[in-house]
Curated annotation (Swiss-Prot):
Motif HGGXW: chain residues: 23-27
Record-given protein name: Kynurenine formamidase
Catalytic-site annotation from UniProt: 95 (nucleophile), 191, 223
Free-text function comment from the UniProt entry: Catalyzes the hydrolysis of N-formyl-L-kynurenine to L-kynurenine, the second step in the kynurenine pathway of tryptophan degradation. Kynurenine may be further oxidized to nicotinic acid, NAD(H) and NADP(H). Required for elimination of toxic metabolites.
Superkingdom of source: Eukaryota
Family, as annotated: Belongs to the kynurenine formamidase family.
UniProt enzyme class: hydrolase
GO MF: arylformamidase activity
Keyword Hydrolase tagged: yes
Record remark: domains: The main chain amide nitrogen atoms of the second glycine and its adjacent residue in the HGGXW motif define the oxyanion hole, and stabilize the oxyanion that forms during the nucleophilic attack by the catalytic serine during substrate cleavage.
Length: 241
């Protein structure tokens, strides 16, 4: 059953600097939602009371497929920027939320693998123009590498994508990363669903393209614990002005 994909979770409204969270759930899991970040947002609020905090959602597969997920995220984030007067945006995505963050950074309007039309291009440009930090937390970045390591994960990949050809690998898209936002790649040693291979794949691509990034690897709990972890909250706060 699909939930209300237009729902935005408001954790804190404090000013024009804002963190926006994107949840995971393998593009298919209704158990993951913007509320995933309630505990993390509360931890961040303790030490960063001037940062507004929101979380958005997106329609799930198999009812819809890529690129609808990224189109929904861009739509909702751009709406927040306009309605809340956000001037400095910090994105944090967990699991496929990190995938979506990467796609927001690198999507090429007009490419068949991404949403079509001038409306998407305009809203994507607005989101990118506001970006300051992007936190990629225990993310999926290469479907090809993912399925080589976890063949059984095709059960959700095949629901979210008509074909692997519809997914642009970071090795193809990294060259379009702008010099603006600071990238943070975060991974938990204890993640039982994703080893470090996805993170290592992405950082190798970033290094090959000489794109600066910050890497934070630590014991941050299991896959569904990372986005509640106090160390992650402390890391985020340390990056904010």
């Amino acid at each position: 059953m699909q939930r209300d994909y237009t729902a935005t979770e408001v954790f804190q409204e404090s000013g024009p600097d804002a963190i926006v969270y994107l949840h995971g759930g393998a593009w298919i899991d209704v158990r993951n939602s913007p509320r995933d970040f309630a505990e993390l947002a509360a931890r961040v609020r303790e030490d960063a009371p001037l940062a507004s905090q929101y979380a958005v959602t997106y329609r799930l597969s198999p009812e819809v497929q890529h690129p609808v997920h990224v189109a929904d995220c861009v739509e909702h984030i751009s709406q927040l920027i306009v309605e809340k007067g956000i001037r400095k945006l910090h994105l944090l995505g967990h699991s496929v939320g990190a995938t979506l963050c990467w796609q927001i950074l690198t999507a090429l309007p007009g490419d068949r693998r991404y949403p079509e039309g001038p409306d998407f291009a305009m809203k994507l440009a607005l989101v990118r123009s506001s970006l300051a930090h992007v936190f990629l937390v225990d993310g999926i970045y290469s479907l090809r590498a993912l399925l080589e390591e976890y063949p059984d994960y095709d059960y959700f990949v095949n629901k979210a994508f008509k074909s692997l050809k519809d997914f642009e690998d970071p090795s193809e898209s990294a060259e379009r990363i702008s010099a603006g936002p600071i990238l943070h790649v975060i991974h938990s040693y204890k993640d039982e669903l994703l080893t470090l291979k996805q993170t290592q794949y992405l950082t190798a691509v970033l290094t090959a393209h000489q794109i600066p990034y910050k890497l934070y690897v630590d014991d941050l709990g299991l896959h569904e614990d990372v986005y509640r972890n106090e160390k992650v909250a402390a890391y985020i706060v340390a990056q904010l002005p």
